C-alpha cells in the first residue's frame, strides 16, 4: 500500500502550505513506497548514483578517463522528445494554436489521473525543489519536480540549481513555483524485479499554461523527464513571458571581445542539430577576437530600466547532442566533458571504460559496446551511439564560460542570430533591414528535420525562432509578442538581427562554407556591421556581405565556394516567398499584420 498524506506533512522540510498540499495530493494519487525530499548535496548524489549503478540503470565510467561520470542506456523506444504526445492544454483551443496538440483540460486531467493512479507503487517519490536562473535574481523562477526516477534527480542536479537552498527561498511568503510531476509509468508490484530503464509505451507530456503545471508520463528520456528544461524554461516560461512582458527563447548566448577590447553579447537561435552547441562553444579561427559563452540552449530576455534587452541563461548544465561533438569540431565542449561529473545517455562504451560516439575522434575504435549493449566494430551496419545520444555536463566546467554567466540580471544584447540548415536559397549571413524584418526572418526560419525529434529525417520544416516545438501558446500571438515587446525598449538599443546558414551547398554538393571555428568570421562581420565598419550589398532579402568585407585571412576557400555561400538567387527566393506564403496561411487570423507586410515587401523587391 502507498502512503497516506499525513507522513508527508510530518517529515517535510518545508512549511509552504501550497507545496505540502500538492506533494500530499500527488502521493495519494501515485501511491509511492516512500517520499524523499532532495537536498542537492554531494553525499546524496553519491548515494543515488550508487543505487542507479546497482540497478543497472547507470554504468560507472573509468575514473581516470571520466571522473565521477556515468553512462545510461535507454529503452530503444524511449530515445527522443515525443512531439506527437506533447500537449498544451489551454482553457481555449485557440490559445494553443496550430503548432501545438490540444485537448480539453478537464478531459486531459481525467486521463492523467487514471494514468498516474498508483503509477509510483513500489518506487521512491523524489521531490526536487529547483530554480531556473539565479536564486538571487529580482524575480526568481522556482519549480518543484516530483519524479519516481533517481536518474532524473542526478540529471536535474547538473541541469538546474536544486535542493535545500532553493527550498529555503520557496519558504518566503508569496514565493511562486511551477508544479511539475513526472512518472515513468512503471509501478512495481511486491516481489516484481525492476528493469534497468523503466518506461511505458504510452507517453504524455502535458502543460496547463494558465495554472503553470507540467505533467509528464511514461518516458525517462531527458527532454521528456527533466521538466525544468524544455517544459518549464521554454513552454511554460514562454506563456509567463507573454503575460509578464519578457521573452523565453531557444537560444545560446555568446560574449565577444574585439581586438580593441570592446565587449559585445549576442544571442542565437538554431533548431536541433544545426550547430547551436558548436557556436555556443566557438573556438575562433580569426585573430585578435576572444569568444566566451554564457549558455548553449535557453535564453530569457527582458528590457532593463535603460531600455536595453538583457539576456540570462536559466540553466546550470549542458545537455548536448553527443554525435558530431568532437576534439576537432568542438574542443571546448570536449574539455568540459573530460573533467567528468557527467551523465551520458545512449553513447557507446569503449573497452577501457570510457565513452565514444560518432565524430568524437578522427579515429574510430576497433571495438566498442554500442548503445544497445551489443558488440560493435567499424564494420557494423548501425552507428555505435544513438544519433540523439546526449552528454549532461555542469556548465561551470567550461573553460571559456564568461564570468557574466553569474550575473542574475544577465547581459545587454548587441545582436540576435537566427540560423537553420538549408542546402540552397539562404545565404551564409544576411542582416535584416530593421527589427520587424528581423522578426520576419525568425518567423520563417527553416531547417531539414533531424534525429533530435522523432519522425521523418530530411524534410524542410518551418521553425519560427527555432521554437516550433516549444511555444507554449498560439504561434501568431507569440510573433505578435515579439513585435509588440520591442516598443518597451530604447529603439536605438534594440539588438541588430541576422539570419545565418552554415550549411549552404555548392553545385557539386559540397559545403560552401567550412563552418565550425570559421563561423567566427561571420559573427565578427555582424559585429562590424553594428559598428558601421563592414561593407554589405543590399539585396531583396536584406544586407549580405561583400566578399571583401569578410575576414578570410588564413582560410582555404575558393572563389566559387564563397560565391555559392553568399549567393541570393532570385528564382530560389521567388519559390521561397511562395513557401512562406503557404506557411503564413497556417496561422489563420493571429499572424501580425506587420509580418504579412514584410512578405509583401519581399515579393515587391523580388519583382
From Swiss-Prot:
Residues bound to substrate: 81, 221-223, 272, 388-390
Active site: 274
Top-level taxonomic group: Bacteria
Enzyme Commission code: 4.1.1.32
An annotated Gene Ontology molecular function: phosphoenolpyruvate carboxykinase (GTP) activity
Pathway info: Carbohydrate biosynthesis; gluconeogenesis
Disulfide bonds: none
InterPro entries listed in its UniProt record: PEP_carboxykin_GTP_CS, PEP_carboxykinase_C, PEP_carboxykinase_GTP, PEP_carboxykinase_GTP_C, PEP_carboxykinase_GTP_N, PEP_carboxykinase_N
Pfam family for this entry, one: PEPCK_N
Cofactor note: Binds 1 Mn(2+) ion per subunit.
Reaction catalyzed: oxaloacetate + GTP = phosphoenolpyruvate + GDP + CO2
Keywords for the protein's UniProt record, in alphabetical order: Cytoplasm, Decarboxylase, Gluconeogenesis, GTP-binding, Lyase, Manganese, Metal-binding, Nucleotide-binding
One GO CC term, this protein: cytosol
Subcellular localization(s) per the UniProt record: Cytoplasm
Family annotation (CDD domains): PEPCK_GTP
Names of the cofactor(s): Mn(2+)
SUPFAM superfamilies in the record: PEP carboxykinase N-terminal domain, PEP carboxykinase-like
Gene3D superfamilies: 3.90.228.20, Phosphoenolpyruvate Carboxykinase, domain 1, Phosphoenolpyruvate Carboxykinase, domain 2
Binding annotation for GTP: 273-278, 390, 421, 516-519
PANTHER family, per the entry: PHOSPHOENOLPYRUVATE CARBOXYKINASE, PHOSPHOENOLPYRUVATE CARBOXYKINASE [GTP]-RELATED
Its job: Catalyzes the conversion of oxaloacetate (OAA) to phosphoenolpyruvate (PEP), the rate-limiting step in the metabolic pathway that produces glucose from lactate and other precursors derived from the citric acid cycle.
Subunit relationships: Monomer.
Name by which UniProt lists this protein: Phosphoenolpyruvate carboxykinase [GTP]
Species: Renibacterium salmoninarum (strain ATCC 33209 / DSM 20767 / JCM 11484 / NBRC 15589 / NCIMB 2235)
Amino acid at each position: 500500500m502507498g502512503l497516506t498524506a499525513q507522513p508527508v506533512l510530518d517529515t517535510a522540510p518545508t512549511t509552504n502550505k501550497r507545496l505540502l498540499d500538492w506533494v500530499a495530493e500527488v502521493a495519494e494519487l501515485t501511491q509511492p513506497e516512500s517520499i524523499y525530499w532532495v537536498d542537492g548535496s554531494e553525499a546524496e548524489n553519491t548515494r543515488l548514483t550508487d543505487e542507479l549503478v546497482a540497478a543497472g540503470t547507470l554504468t560507472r565510467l573509468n575514473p581516470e578517463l571520466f571522473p565521477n561520470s556515468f553512462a545510461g542506456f535507454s529503452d530503444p523506444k524511449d530515445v527522443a522528445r515525443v512531439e506527437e504526445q506533447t500537449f498544451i492544454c489551454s482553457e481555449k483551443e485557440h490559445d494553443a494554436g496550430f503548432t501545438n496538440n490540444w485537448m480539453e483540460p478537464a478531459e486531459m486531467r481525467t486521463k492523467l489521473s487514471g494514468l498516474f493512479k498508483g503509477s509510483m507503487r513500489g518506487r521512491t517519490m523524489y521531490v526536487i525543489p529547483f530554480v531556473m536562473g539565479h536564486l538571487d535574481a529580482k524575480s526568481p523562477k522556482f519549480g518543484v519536480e516530483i519524479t519516481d526516477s533517481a536518474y532524473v534527480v542526478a540529471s536535474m542536479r547538473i541541469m538546474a540549481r536544486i535542493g535545500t537552498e532553493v527550498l529555503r527561498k520557496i519558504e518566503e511568503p508569496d514565493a511562486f513555483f511551477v508544479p511539475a510531476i513526472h512518472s515513468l509509468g512503471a509501478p512495481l508490484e511486491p516481489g516484481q524485479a525492476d528493469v534497468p530503464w523503466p518506461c511505458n509505451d504510452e507517453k504524455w507530456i502535458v502543460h496547463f499554461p494558465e495554472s503553470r503545471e507540467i505533467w509528464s508520463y511514461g518516458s525517462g528520456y531527458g527532454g521528456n523527464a527533466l521538466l525544468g528544461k524544455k517544459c518549464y524554461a521554454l513552454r511554460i516560461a514562454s506563456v509567463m513571458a507573454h503575460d509578464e512582458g519578457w521573452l523565453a527563447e531557444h537560444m545560446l548566448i555568446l560574449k565577444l571581445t574585439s581586438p580593441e577590447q570592446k565587449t559585445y553579447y549576442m544571442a542565437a537561435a538554431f533548431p536541433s542539430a544545426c550547430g547551436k552547441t558548436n557556436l555556443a562553444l566557438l573556438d575562433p579561427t580569426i585573430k585578435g577576437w576572444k569568444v566566451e559563452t554564457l549558455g548553449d540552449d535557453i535564453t530569457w530576455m527582458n528590457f532593463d530600466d535603460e531600455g536595453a534587452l538583457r539576456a540570462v541563461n536559466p540553466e546550470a548544465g549542458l545537455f548536448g547532442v553527443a554525435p558530431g561533438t568532437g576534439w576537432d569540431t568542438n574542443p571546448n565542449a570536449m574539455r568540459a566533458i573530460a573533467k567528468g561529473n557527467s551523465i551520458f545517455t545512449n553513447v557507446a562504451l569503449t573497452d577501457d571504460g570510457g565513452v565514444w560516439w560518432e565524430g568524437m575522434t578522427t579515429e574510430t575504435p576497433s571495438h566498442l559496446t554500442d548503445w544497445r549493449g551489443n558488440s560493435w566494430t567499424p564494420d557494423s551496419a548501425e552507428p555505435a551511439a544513438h544519433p540523439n545520444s546526449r552528454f549532461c555536463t555542469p556548465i561551470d566546467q567550461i573553460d571559456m564560460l564568461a564570468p557574466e554567466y553569474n550575473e542574475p540580471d544577465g547581459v545587454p544584447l548587441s545582436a540576435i542570430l537566427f540560423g537553420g540548415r538549408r542546402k540552397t536559397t539562404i545565404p551564409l549571413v544576411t542582416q535584416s533591414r530593421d527589427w520587424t524584418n528581423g522578426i520576419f526572418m525568425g518567423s520563417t526560419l527553416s531547417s531539414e528535420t533531424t534525429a533530435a525529434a522523432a519522425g521523418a529525417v530530411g524534410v524542410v520544416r518551418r521553425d519560427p525562432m527555432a521554437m516550433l516545438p516549444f511555444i507554449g501558446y498560439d504561434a501568431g500571438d507569440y510573433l505578435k509578442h515579439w513585435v509588440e515587446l520591442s516598443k518597451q525598449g530604447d529603439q536605438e538599443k534594440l539588438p541588430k538581427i541576422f539570419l545565418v546558414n552554415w550549411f549552404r551547398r555548392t553545385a557539386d554538393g559540397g559545403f560552401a562554407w567550412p563552418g565550425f571555428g570559421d563561423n567566427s568570421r561571420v559573427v565578427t562581420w555582424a559585429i562590424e556591421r553594428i559598428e558601421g565598419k563592414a561593407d554589405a550589398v543590399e539585396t531583396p532579402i536584406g544586407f549580405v556581405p561583400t566578399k571583401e568585407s569578410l575576414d578570410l585571412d588564413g582560410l582555404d576557400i575558393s572563389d566559387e565556394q564563397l560565391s555559392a555561400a553568399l549567393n541570393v538567387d532570385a528564382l530560389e527566393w521567388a519559390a521561397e516567398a511562395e513557401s512562406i506564403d503557404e506557411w503564413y496561411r497556417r496561422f489563420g487570423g493571429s499572424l501580425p499584420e506587420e509580418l504579412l507586410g514584410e512578405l509583401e515587401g519581399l515579393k515587391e523587391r523580388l519583382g
